[in-house]
Amino acid sequence: MGETEITCAAGTIVGTVRDNARLFDAIPFLEKAHPFDDPVALKQGLLLDATTPHPNALSVSAPLSARPGTDCPVVVWLSAPAELGDGFVHVHVPHRDGFEGFLPFAADAIGHFRGVADVKLALRWIQRNIEAFGGDPTNVTVVGAGEEAAVALWLCRRDHYAGEFRRVWAASPEFPRAPYEKRKWIVRYLLSAPLTRAKLNELAENRPGRVGRSYRRYAKFFGPMGPQPHDASELAELAVVRVEDALDPGAIAEFAR
């Protein structure tokens, strides 16, 4: 195993070579922020060490032979990546979930969720940088299962879709069971705090375990929080969408080529 470097708009990114692939395990793409703040794209032109995995950074895996102009299909995984065979550039994109990602504030625009916005900025990063890894920015497929499939479909809405990807494979999408307004009282009770950005950021800083524990209790009884309400008639016609029961690696590989 050795090191490898790629220079792109984001900067110079250091990764590793392993199993006939170039691996970049932790590429930061967002500025550091409080848990309930909206995401801000990281400035470009940095020296980035992507040799060690990190949960809040995207990761890229590219064929060892891939170079700018190879134009490999790009698969963006919101769920855990699967093996699709040779010739793909894989990008795993993290996003905030739970209260941090999907608890709405009064000042938020309709349809805006921080967890979705995290992925949106990652997709913009991919458009600007993936060609340096040997990927084709015009041939991007987003894949997600369950809660992540719901995020993928939300990105296909006409008020969100801006051509950053061509296709979506959504496996068993899981949207919230009821409108947030019907659950707001229990969220306030569990957190024991005003449901404002400032107060929840303060809570997350002073009592970091409470937000996570409260969300786990919430999800146990009411299911996951996520973007809502879902209406298939609001999807952009330019996005090719497949809603399936499961993640089928063989079918996804054929779909994404």
What are the residue ranges of the model-derived segments?
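Alpha/beta-hydrolase active-site loop
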Residues: I110-A132
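Mature extracellular catalytic domain of secreted serine hydrolases
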Residues: Q44-L64, D97, G111, A117-K120, ...
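Non-catalytic accessory segments of hydrolases
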Residues: M1-G111, G223, D245-A256
